[in-house]
Amino acid sequence: GKRVVIKAGDSIPVKQRKGAAELVVTCIAAQQGVIKPADDAKDQKNPLAGSVPAKPEDLSDNANSVATLFSFGNFRFLDCGDLTWNVESKLVTPVNPIGIIDVYQVNHHGLASSNNPILLGSVQPTVSVMNNGHTKGCTPQTFATLNATKSIKAMYQVHKNLRKDSENNTTDELIANKTDRDSCKGHYVKMAVSPDGDSYTISIPAHGHS
């Protein structure tokens, strides 16, 4: 088959559904390269640029993560995989080419090496969903960043943080799995978007939460 190396700015072709909003899937970062702002936005400097110190260079493959923006009508979902701190900042400064989003897949399981406040403050998500583990991710620094992001109205977690720092958890109704690993049922967080892209629902079907 054909092998393609994706780069920032590439669009991923997807089959469209007749009568529904157009789904656009755009790679916004890959191999530490980031998408360029539109020509008419190059002078719109991000006021958050430089507001948070950089961290030591990340030499792991996490910094090379592929970040993807899904646009479906007016709905926008950001998934940056394991992208780390300095590249997150590079993605939205000195100009923010992403704009405002609806749902943010919390980067890198909620580890402190990711989820730069500059990124969160720039894209201003309404909802965050953290794919953390019972003891992995959901670090105090990331949890504090999410709490401090004024645009966020609901913070979902796939697992409850069962470490000693249990204060770093969202409310129980927004957590899919609350037991230890041996008792975990693998409940999931579901996102459904209306065909016109004008509304969406986040739910945990196993708990009847929506």
Task: Report residues per predicted region.
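Active-site environment of divalent metal-dependent phosphoester hydrolases
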Residues: 12-13, 34-35, 84-90, 110-115, ...
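Active-site-adjacent alpha-helix of alpha/beta-hydrolase-fold enzymes
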Residues: 127, 137, 142-154
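N-proximal accessory regions
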Residues: 124-127, 207
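Extracytoplasmic/periplasmic, Sec-exported soluble proteins
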Residues: 19, 60, 79, 96, ...
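Active-site neighborhood of phospho(di)ester-bond hydrolases with catalytic His/Asp-centered motifs
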Residues: 77-83, 100-111, 126-133, 156-159
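Short, conserved loop/helix-junction motifs that constitute active-site signature segments
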Residues: 96-100, 119-124, 146-150
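Active-site catalytic pocket residues across diverse enzymes, especially alpha/beta-hydrolases
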Residues: 91, 95
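Flexible, acidic/histidine-containing loops and adjacent segments that form or flank the divalent-metal
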Residues: 1-86, 148-210
